[in-house]
Amino acid sequence: MEKLTILLLVAAVLMSIQALNQEQHQRAKINLLSKRKAPAERWWRWGGCLLWFGRCTKDSECCSDSCDRTYCELARFPEGW
């Protein structure tokens, strides 16, 4: 009877350790994923400025230096357009 009790205690400890390791691994995975930028965001941002059709609010955010208050334009249009 004593051997069975010890065996059950050892099994419970091993299962607890396994569950703890899995939980820590999941947390590490979540932290890693939360630090990454979305692929679309990485693609649209280049050298600190937004490429064509990146979301913007002012000209200086765009590589083309031309924001139409919503998206970056491919190039700045001449005055009067």
Swiss-Prot record:
Residues 20-44 form a propeptide. This is Conotoxin Vc6.13. The presence of a 'disulfide through disulfide knot' structurally defines this protein as a knottin. The cysteine framework is VI/VII (C-C-CC-C-C). Its main location: secreted. One of its GO terms (molecular function) is toxin activity. It comes from Conus victoriae (Queen Victoria cone). Keywords: Disulfide bond, Ion channel impairing toxin, Knottin, Secreted, Signal, Toxin. InterPro entries: Conotoxin. Residues 1-19 form the signal peptide. Inhibits voltage-gated ion channels. Expressed by the venom duct. Disulfide bonds join 49-63, 56-67, 62-72. It is found in: Secreted. GO terms for cellular component: extracellular region. Belongs to the conotoxin O2 superfamily.
